[in-house]
Amino acid sequence: MINSNDKNESDTFGIIRKILSERIMVLDGAMGTEIQKFKLKDNDYRGEEFKDFPHELGGNNDLLSLTQPHIIREIHCKYLEAGADFIETNTFNGNIFSQADYKMEHLVKRINIESARLAKSACEEYTKKDPSRPRFVCGAVGPTNKTASISPSVERPEARNVLFDELVSGYLEQVEALVEGGIDVILVETVFDSLNCKAALFAIEEFFKTYSPRLPVFVSGTIVDKSGRTLSGQTGEAFYTSVASANLMVFGLNCALGAQEMRPFLQNISKCSECYVSCYPNAGLPNTFGGYDETPEMMAEQIKEFAESGLLNIVGGCCGTSPDHIRAFCNAIEGIAPRAIPTLVPNTTLSGLEPLVFTKELNFVNVGERCNVSGSRRFANLIKANKYEEALSVARQQVEAGAQIIDINMDEGMIDAVAAIQKFLFFIGSEPEISKVPIMLDSSNFDVVEAGLKCVQGKCIVNSISLKVGEELFIKQAKIVKQYGASVVVMAFDENGQATSKEEKVRICYRSYKILTEQVGFYPQDIIFDPNILTIATGLEEHNNYGVEFIEATREIKALMPLTRVSGGVSNLSFSFRGNEPLREAMHSAFLYYAIAAGMDMGIVNAGALPIYDDIPKDLLKLVEDAILNRTNDATEKLLEYAQANNKSEKANVEVEEWRNKPVSERIAHALVKGITTYIIEDTEEARNTLPSSLSVIEGPLMGGMNVVGDLFGAGKMFLPQVIKSARVMKKAVAHLIPFMEEEKRLKRLEKGNDEAAEDEPDNAGVVVLATVKGDVHDIGKNIVGVVLGCNNYKVIDIGVMTPCEKIVEAIIANKADVVGLSGLITPSLDEMIYVASELERLKFKIPLMIGGATTSQIHTAVKISPHYSQPTVHVLDASRSVTVVQSLLDPNNKEVFAEDVSQQYAELREKHYASLKDRKYTSLEKARQHCVKVNWKTIQPVKPTFLGTQVFKEYSLEKLVTKIDWNPFFVTWQLRGKYPNRGYPRIFNDETVGAEAKKLFDDAQTMLKEIVDKKLLNARGVIGFYPANSIDEDIIIYDHNDDETRSKPIATLFGLRQQNEKETDEPYIAIGDYIAPVSSGVKDYIGLFAVSSGFGLEDMVEKYKKENDDYSSIMAKALADRLAEALAEAVHEDVRREHWAYEKDQALSNEDLFKIKYKGIRPAPGYPAQPDHTEMKTIWSLMNVNENTSIELTDHMAMLPGAAVCGVYFSHEHAKYFSVGKITKEQIESYASRKQITKEEAERWLSSILSYDRLPLVK
């Protein structure tokens, strides 16, 4: 609270408030990047005290407060000198969870005390220098390396790697030590999980129960990306709502984003926050190398705009910022008034992943009642049977039906309610479509309530407490609820029992209100009264007025305590008529009509099952209103008569596919949008029989439906797999119509008395020719683009893979193409694209050129391709952009403007590119060699493989490969990308936007995989080889496998390239040759080679799907073959490490660790960053007779056939790592060409993507 007069407050509160009323205050910048500038080694971290500590300590920055305190104090002083008002202690990881990584949990107290003392002494020094500008120490409480809201296990969404109580204990230890060390402020920062933060705030409150005076508490959350959410999925506003009741002095955002990206989220926080607001962004987003590029001047300009817009009270810097940044911030904000705290109308606000604000527009808030073991037999049975995932469907249905809050009740004699509610809440936490709404924890057992409070990151509701337990226990329970930050339902009960009359209801509620607001400190808007909805029409006269008593009590409560809310369990009203759901629902609807008018704000209802008041039959409405309002003496009797005459124990719930009853055009559109092929033939036939011609069916309902698909895809409401399924439906329909169209054409020709083919083709938006260029066999992306364009009424002519330029030219002419698109995956394709562009220019074509594929980029298109073709040349990032680009290129009104915009943009890119080449610095090849990877080969004895020569495997187990699949690239192929916290497999399934479609796609993939394995539709095979080897500089000399002892017969050389980008540090300039013992060392080393493919049989699969007009299955097969090829490479490499080379015999890694390369050795591939020259593949093919042994072919352009193939080189060196050669100079190109005995021009052609200078393409 900003203007708190709490007598327990420290003097710091008043001082900081006064300064904040006058100016924007400044926090320090990054600690980690400043520490990095000292280039500390492991011994520096150890110091004298820990020199013999048995675990590695490098990177434990918090430990430096003990071992290198002068460095930490120096950094503090630099920030203070730059103008910081607040400096943070060096304790971001000063908790038992993070220190456990270093086996240093026992040092947590010391680290925090000493860190606080270091910062305090620095602040005191600078305050003494200028007493008019006091400096303050913020005790940094980091997020820990655990998350209480996210499961660490794919298979067990309810699992957690830390629990609330464990977090509280860990945070309490840290807070106690920081305060002992002398901090002025507690800063809970970089919060990525609100439940972790709530645990920290709970611990802080526990601490201040016994310690005085209180210190100010700041909280700073982290929005992880442009989706505007924390890692655990909450929006910034929802996070603020979760912690707002903790009497924070400051709430803000830090880390993950640069200032520009953070601005919209900061603005939202600034609007809703009733405390001071802070922000300390990163120095921009991380660059390619993980660094930060925004200069102090750049950031200061953005910070100044924040301040001028009234968004800031405190500003600082996070990752990548320095004392220079802080100095620039101080100068930028000087003289700008601080943000004014907004005066907001007090309102009840709750949160799940998203906030729920009780505005007037909401009218009435539905609390879903079906997750109640007492009220739903189905839910109870699922919980008892331990079927929690199925039970989630009950909650999901409630949300989908309109519930804005979910009530959860586990009170049942045969259920362990504490365990059940925690487990179910953890399951819900992994389901964003459910956890987006707030939770109501419903139990008569307070232990169950508190157990639930420890599992929910949002601001929830406790249902309920009451005075029936006595005033002392009521207050105790209320204080606990408040400490967890929840709102509370208070029942109209007291020591004498349940209130039934209006007067008793109002009296008990008012008494409860006074206690909660005056003795416990509850805000009125966090109090929800339940004045007891009791059962009417029971046959007992005294019950007849219960409805009226509730309605009138509600009216008075709202007049007496207007900021509070009124709720109730609506189904209690009709309990007498259990089993007659239509009657009960009519009673509920009519009751709410009057109760809402009296001021009832919310109620526990079966969301989605309430009829509209005006839709209730008039005769029934009169009966239920007579009973509810107690208008006649015989109301109960008449209602009972009606119930007996109209007894319907169950609603007729026949699942009818209603869309099948719609007109045929709507059925076709529905089938296209939903991807349903079941009825498309019969619907198409029906349309053909009702429309003038078969062509009319295509141009009418089919294209109409596809237009809807195109619009939905363009608006982001459909995703790529759905679009491809739509195309499958379309193709099946068209295939059915083609014979009829041919017959109609024949009859027309007969009518005209000639045999000339009629040209009544369906209208289209334009003709697009697509081709994978010569030498390249990869076409998944191109095929997807073709489908998407086809769905948007473009006629697509796909001329396949490995397409020579002349064939592309012929297709353009023959089909009168409006646009041509070139695709390629491998680096040599880039030169082929340049050649095609040059030929199109020479032949004076006037159509636009689109460039796409994994190896292409906007900068390459602008610099290398566009200058060779005078017509519009556009790089298309993925299929989702293709439609917009083609539309823009062909739009008669705007195509010239679009082309000019692209041309201007590409000209600017070229200018920047050439300017950057001038600015980059490269070291000479000789100097780079002198600074190669240093290895003491005298101490290393390389492991000899178990055999030398080659080994062929003709049929690798597909079952084993399925278990090794990395699914993340699979979803990238289909252009499905989740947002935090749901990026990557399997969390993508939880993503609000793409999760459902990703799961469907994954299920389809599993079905096809099973068929592939069961029927052996694909064959996985390959060859591996091991050879004696030594290195000379960058190159690896390979000897005959029968010449291991003398090594006198070199049989081949693998040529390498060395990094030349000048480095600011003493890091080595790496080449692959560094990982093999040099010839001069005398050490016998070895190298491995491999080539594998899982693509044998793929052509047959694709051909079958093409005949069935099934693009979806065709693309799926290719995507799975690619995944299986990568899995094969991973599996064989594992076999090599454990058996064939056997340098890690006992290794047993999880898939996750495999994909993260947590093993010794690497397997780089020619054509990739460590050796970008594809022609090195020829050496692999020659040495191992790959073509003869496996039938994997190599094209002239170094593409492998089948395309689902992987090849590379095995290194066993323990320090070998993947790296990127980066740009190289002409000097190295000349050396490389000379060693390899090729021309300089040929070397430049194959290495064009990494040249540090420009060169002309080869003329063909």
From Swiss-Prot:
The keyword Protein biosynthesis does not apply. It holds the Pfam family S-methyl_trans. CDD domains: methionine_synthase_B12_BD, MeTr. One of its GO terms (biological process) is homocysteine metabolic process. Residues 766-883 form the B12-binding domain. This is Methionine synthase. L-homocysteine is bound via the zinc atom. It comes from the Eukaryota. Binds 1 zinc ion per subunit. Pathway: Amino-acid biosynthesis; L-methionine biosynthesis via de novo pathway; L-methionine from L-homocysteine (MetH route): step 1/1. Zn(2+) binds at residues 255, 318-319. GO terms for molecular function: cobalamin binding; methionine synthase activity; zinc ion binding.
